[in-house]
């Protein structure tokens, strides 16, 4: 046996393997003898088929099976002697098929897992977001919730931003109708970004019953190719103007949020609890993101190409499953290269985390699984039902284990990291406009 390392890929190895022809032939002969009494061939009594005919009928198939088994056995012995940890499946290339009474010769090509040196992980600095939920955050959330429950009332004044208007419109391109260029009783809220800027500007200031004709040019990148970049004439009739009216924060409003007795203070307490839970979860995500990036920055590791390709397969499958779940057909033109960077990051991080977990004994404990499920169930309307649903299936429990392992690794790093508190607002923490669910 000879082992070679490929210069272009530090994780690729080649092993030259030789399988004894005599050993193959001897095992094939034994199996044919065991098989002969069991086969039935027309013209011969059971168990009386000549061995020559048995060999003609089944010899090639059995030789293939025996050769495969002996080759795999020799390969396993070879990699065990070298203490290789194989990544993926090896590729066997026939170098000599054994047709001239010589031994069977093969070359096995495969990749191995890298040796990962974790180094000093005690010098990592992590910025921890700090936020206390108070009246400001609660009032902002109440405003969002009020806007989500906006009512509209008819008004006798010109249309302005924030109003809901009902219009008829008729568009023409060179005097002819075009697809999507006309509608009756179309309702839209002005200022929410659903209309082209020039089209909306023409509606602003119009009054109920007013008709207006104007020209506008569609953007060059407009999705409707027929009118993209072209000048179009529109005639609009304004049927109705409705002004927004926010609900009062009272008992009825509290009931609309699920507070059965309409207690406003209880509603505010629940909003605060939800914001605190959302804040805790988001801080945890932020810390985890920093820990993962720090590990990638500090630890250099070669990654097996075959694992990257397998990860790309998984990413593509995730995309297709998401499309199917949303009612869209599977994409037929996904380019593997577009997933390469993300796949490499996942594989590299996975190898580092596995090494960290193995080195420091950060395995999953049953009580951690239970705690993880109970905590995440709190964001659902019926936590107890969610908890029972998870524990009813060993497969679901198995899916949670990698998440808990990640949490264990993150906690281990955070216990040793230099934590720097960083005061933030709720909006800064969430990274988007203030919102909350109740």
Curated annotation (Swiss-Prot):
<keyword id="KW-0697">Rotamase</keyword>
<keyword id="KW-0143">Chaperone</keyword>
<dbReference type="GO" id="GO:0003755">
    <property type="term" value="F:peptidyl-prolyl cis-trans isomerase activity"/>
</dbReference>
<dbReference type="GO" id="GO:0051301">
    <property type="term" value="P:cell division"/>
</dbReference>
<dbReference type="Pfam" id="PF00254">
    <property type="entry name" value="FKBP_C"/>
</dbReference>
<dbReference type="GO" id="GO:0044183">
    <property type="term" value="F:protein folding chaperone"/>
</dbReference>
<keyword id="KW-0132">Cell division</keyword>
<keyword id="KW-0131">Cell cycle</keyword>
<dbReference type="InterPro" id="IPR027304">
    <property type="entry name" value="Trigger_fact/SurA_dom_sf"/>
</dbReference>
<keyword id="KW-0413">Isomerase</keyword>
<comment type="similarity">
    <text>Belongs to the FKBP-type PPIase family. Tig subfamily.</text>
</comment>
<dbReference type="GO" id="GO:0005737">
    <property type="term" value="C:cytoplasm"/>
</dbReference>
<dbReference type="GO" id="GO:0015031">
    <property type="term" value="P:protein transport"/>
</dbReference>
<feature type="domain" description="PPIase FKBP-type">
    <location>
        <begin position="162"/>
        <end position="247"/>
    </location>
</feature>
<dbReference type="InterPro" id="IPR037041">
    <property type="entry name" value="Trigger_fac_C_sf"/>
</dbReference>
<dbReference type="InterPro" id="IPR008881">
    <property type="entry name" value="Trigger_fac_ribosome-bd_bac"/>
</dbReference>
<dbReference type="InterPro" id="IPR036611">
    <property type="entry name" value="Trigger_fac_ribosome-bd_sf"/>
</dbReference>
<dbReference type="InterPro" id="IPR046357">
    <property type="entry name" value="PPIase_dom_sf"/>
</dbReference>
<dbReference type="InterPro" id="IPR001179">
    <property type="entry name" value="PPIase_FKBP_dom"/>
</dbReference>
<comment type="function">
    <text>Involved in protein export. Acts as a chaperone by maintaining the newly synthesized protein in an open conformation. Functions as a peptidyl-prolyl cis-trans isomerase.</text>
</comment>
<dbReference type="Pfam" id="PF05698">
    <property type="entry name" value="Trigger_C"/>
</dbReference>
<dbReference type="GO" id="GO:0043335">
    <property type="term" value="P:protein unfolding"/>
</dbReference>
<dbReference type="InterPro" id="IPR008880">
    <property type="entry name" value="Trigger_fac_C"/>
</dbReference>
<dbReference type="Pfam" id="PF05697">
    <property type="entry name" value="Trigger_N"/>
</dbReference>
<keyword id="KW-0963">Cytoplasm</keyword>
<dbReference type="InterPro" id="IPR005215">
    <property type="entry name" value="Trig_fac"/>
</dbReference>
<dbReference type="GO" id="GO:0051083">
    <property type="term" value="P:'de novo' cotranslational protein folding"/>
</dbReference>
<dbReference type="GO" id="GO:0061077">
    <property type="term" value="P:chaperone-mediated protein folding"/>
</dbReference>
<protein>
    <recommendedName>
        <fullName>Trigger factor</fullName>
        <ecNumber>5.2.1.8</ecNumber>
    </recommendedName>
</protein>
<dbReference type="GO" id="GO:0043022">
    <property type="term" value="F:ribosome binding"/>
</dbReference>
């Amino acid at each position: 046996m000879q082992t070679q390392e490929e210069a272009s890929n530090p994780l690729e190895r080649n092993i030259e393997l030789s399988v004894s022809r005599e050993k193959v032939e001897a095992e094939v002969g034994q199996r044919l003898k065991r098989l002969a009494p069991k086969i039935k061939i027309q013209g011969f009594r059971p168990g009386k088929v000549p061995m020559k005919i048995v060999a003609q009928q089944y010899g090639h198939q059995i030789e293939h099976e025996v050769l495969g088994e002996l080759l795999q056995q020799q390969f396993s012995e070879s990699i065990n002697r070298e203490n290789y940890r194989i990544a993926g499946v090896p590729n066997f290339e026939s170098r000599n098929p054994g047709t001239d009474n010589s031994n069977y010769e093969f070359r096995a090509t495969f990749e191995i897992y890298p040796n990962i040196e974790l180094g000093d992980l005690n010098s990592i600095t992590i910025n921890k977001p700090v936020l206390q939920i108070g009246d400001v955050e609660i009032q902002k959330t109440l405003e969002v919730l009020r806007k989500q429950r906006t009512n509209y009332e008819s008004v006798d004044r010109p249309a302005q931003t924030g109003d809901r208007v009902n219009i008829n419109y008729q568009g023409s391109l060179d005097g002819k109708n075009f697809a999507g260029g006309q509608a009756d009783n179309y309702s839209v809220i002005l200022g929410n970004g659903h209309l082209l800027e020039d089209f909306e500007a023409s509606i602003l200031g119009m009054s109920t019953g007013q008709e207006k004709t104007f020209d506008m040019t569609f953007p060059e990148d407009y999705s409707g190719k027929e009118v993209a970049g072209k000048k179009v004439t529109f005639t609009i009739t304004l049927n109705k103007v409705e002004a927004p009216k926010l609900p009062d924060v009272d008992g009825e409003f509290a009931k609309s949020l699920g507070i059965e007795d309409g207690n406003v203070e209880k509603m505010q307490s629940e909003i605060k609890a939800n914001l605190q839970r959302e804040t805790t979860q988001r801080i945890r995500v932020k810390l985890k993101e920093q820990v993962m990036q720090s590990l990638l920055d500090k630890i250099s590791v070669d990654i097996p190409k075959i694992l990257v390709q397998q990860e790309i397969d998984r990413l593509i499958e995730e995309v297709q499953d998401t499309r199917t779940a949303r009612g869209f057909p599977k994409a037929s033109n996904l380019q593997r290269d577009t997933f390469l960077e993300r796949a490499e990051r996942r594989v590299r991080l996975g190898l580092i985390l596995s090494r960290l977990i193995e080195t420091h004994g950060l395995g999953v404990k049953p009580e951690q699984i239970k705690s993880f499920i109970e905590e995440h169930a709190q964001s659902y309307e019926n936590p107890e039902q969610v908890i029972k649903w998870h524990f009813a299936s060993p497969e679901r429990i198995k899916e949670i284990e990698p998440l808990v392992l990640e949490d264990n690794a993150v906690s281990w790093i955070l216990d040793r990291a230099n934590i720097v508190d960083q005061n933030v607002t709720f909006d800064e923490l969430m990274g988007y406009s203030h919102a909350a669910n109740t």
